[in-house]
């Protein structure tokens, strides 16, 4: 009986270790923030014209923003900033602008607490600010790229990973309120 119990605990420990190591691997793999099946637009924002800061005061988010370009279906990520997808429109222009970051506490970890009506402020290098209001939030599978589709309004789609082993995306969509 002791031998069976010992083997049970050894197998359980190895299983937990495997899941833990796999979780660390997923957290450190840049491709985890990508949306499977997303095809970027042909137009790309000129370097330096994109936003350089995003603030969601109600969630304690105040981050620098770097420009990101998908290359060979790899979505660049940073451990210290959010990423603006340069193949999407500039935030505030007509269309669906995309900003994403890891779900770490220091990045978009609190985005999962976003509520309809909260303000998102995007700042540009010339100190121009665009204010958006969160219209809805949702959790979608990693392959539901339709959430990133072009739109006819002036929206910004913010997203981060969520779910078991980052298998889903938490999405907050905000609509342009004003130009300040």
Briefly describe each language-model feature range:
Residues 1-13:
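N-terminal Sec-pathway targeting helices
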